[in-house]
Regions:
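Alpha-helical support elements that line or immediately flank enzyme active sites
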Residues: 12-31, 126-150, 290-314
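Short, charge-patterned binding micro-sites
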Residues: 40-58, 327-331
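Internal helix-turn-beta structural module
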Residues: 46, 318, 325-431
């Protein structure tokens, strides 16, 4: 019997994502000037205010206000009517030094004996449902919003009313074998200008103006946004876009008040959007604002790297990887594998886990080195998903009034998405 599964995403202008991006921009700034920085930075955003808090150990001095304002401006909060604007909002910092008790458990004379920054379990997941080994409902949800943001920033004349805050949700019908059959429902909620004004102060005139705005936005979503997103996918995914899709565009009827003025945003509140959209599993730890000594982040990336390479190598069509740690201990407590009965090798999931244990060094320092995580690569992860992205080499420049010369870094983004272990896995599993 078929079933429906739903995933959601939020835009870079969503208040929780504004907070995530500020936290990761601060992390990048510290790492650009001091790669050994230990950072745990949280951000709160609300009407006209940004609050920064957390723990840092670094030789770098960062102008946190300047970094926060630059992120807010880059996202697009540049108008006073948003009630949250880059130049005028208040930025309060309560960032202080990292606890010595934590630091003594993390740092070691031999860096490869570096202990995990905390206890916990982390998960990685991959499926052959899409070309990037991600769940399709989540991937579509991300694509809808990243394309909407592209239009807002680069082709404003096409949808000139767009504001930064937005959410999406996609429901897909699957058959018993987990194969997508069709897209059932698409939800788009996008913040917008009040671009149709009522003829007078009567309720009827206000309702008519609101309906005119909603009709225009719904028409643009269906005629402009949906075809552009469809074109990004292979034919088998395009075929899922039928004329039977149910669309809900701004279903409340109006979305003018939004962003941090509409809802308070906090770092780390969109962990399912950040990962697998409800597929697989999540250990509960957020990513943004944390340097790679925090296994909440680094081990989750490493687990995704393992899962993706296992599926790409043909070990299974779907894989969940769990790894767990104790604070101050380098080696993980366990590695667990679940192939959901979709394994392509004559091994139990426990036997697959044993091979994975031998193939991948999951000590925190080994993960940092393998995935090049001691670089300023994190701002780009903080919107539209940490997983399923395209690895790429970029040049990043950091300028601070506290440093005489800019720092220019060549860094590799999304290294955990590379398929660089496929050959080793095939050899190990005899594929």
């Amino acid at each position: 019997m078929s079933y429906l599964f739903t995933s959601e995403s939020v835009s870079e202008g969503h208040p929780d994502k504004v907070a995530d991006q500020i936290s990761d921009a601060l992390l990048d700034e510290f790492l650009a000037y001091d790669k050994s920085s230990k950072v745990a930075c949280e951000t709160l955003v609300t009407t006209g205010q940004v609050v920064l808090a957390g723990e840092v150990k670094s030789s770098a001095y960062v102008d946190v206000q300047e970094v926060a304002r630059a992120v807010i401006e880059r996202i697009g909060y540049t108008k006073s009517e948003y009630q949250f604007e880059a130049k005028s909002c208040g930025v309060f910092s309560a960032i202080h030094e990292q606890s010595g008790d934590i630091n003594r458990g993390v740092e070691r004379q031999d860096p490869y004996n570096q202990g995990a920054g905390d206890q916990g379990m982390m998960f990685g997941y991959a499926t052959n449902e899409t070309e990037n080994y991600m769940p399709l409902a989540l991937d579509l949800s991300h694509s809808l919003l990243s394309e909407l943001a592209f239009i807002r920033k680069n082709e404003i004349e096409k949808m000139p009313y767009l504001r930064p805050d937005a959410k999406s949700q996609v429901t897909i019908e699957y058959d018993d074998n987990g194969t997508p059959l069709r897209i059932d429902t698409i939800v788009i909620s996008t913040q917008h200008d009040e671009f149709v004004l009522p003829a007078d102060d009567s309720k009827a005139a206000k309702d008519a103006a609101d309906k005119a705005m909603q009709d225009r936005i719904a028409a643009d979503v269906k005629s402009l946004l949906i075809p552009r997103v469809m074109a990004q996918y292979p034919p088998q995914v395009q075929a899922l876009f039928t004329d039977k899709i149910t669309y809900h565009v701004n279903p409340t009827g109006k979305f003018v008040i939004g962003g941090p003025h509409g809802d308070t945003g906090l770092t780390g509140r969109k962990i399912i959007v950040d990962t697998y959209g409800g597929k697989g599993a999540h250990g509960g730890g957020a990513f943004s604002g944390k340097d790679p000594s925090k296994v909440d982040r680094s081990a989750a990336y490493a687990a995704r790297h393992i899962a993706k390479n296992l599926v790409a190598a043909g070990v299974a069509d779907e894989v969940l990887v769990q790894v767990s740690y104790a604070i101050g201990v380098a080696k993980p407590m366990n590695i667990f594998i679940n192939t959901y009965g979709r394994s392509n090798v004559k091994l139990t999931d426990g036997e697959i886990a044993e091979k994975v244990w031998n193939l991948f060094d999951m000590r925190p320092k080994a993960i940092e080195d393998r995935l090049k995580l001691r670089n300023p690569i994190y701002f780009e992860t903080a919107s539209y998903g940490h997983m399923g992205r395209t690895p790429q080499v970029v040049i990043k420049e950091f300028n601070s009034r506290y440093n005489t010369a800019p720092v220019i870094c060549e860094v590799e983004l999304f290294t955990w998405e590379k398929l660089d272990y496929v050959d080793q896995i095939k050899e190990e599993f005899g594929l």
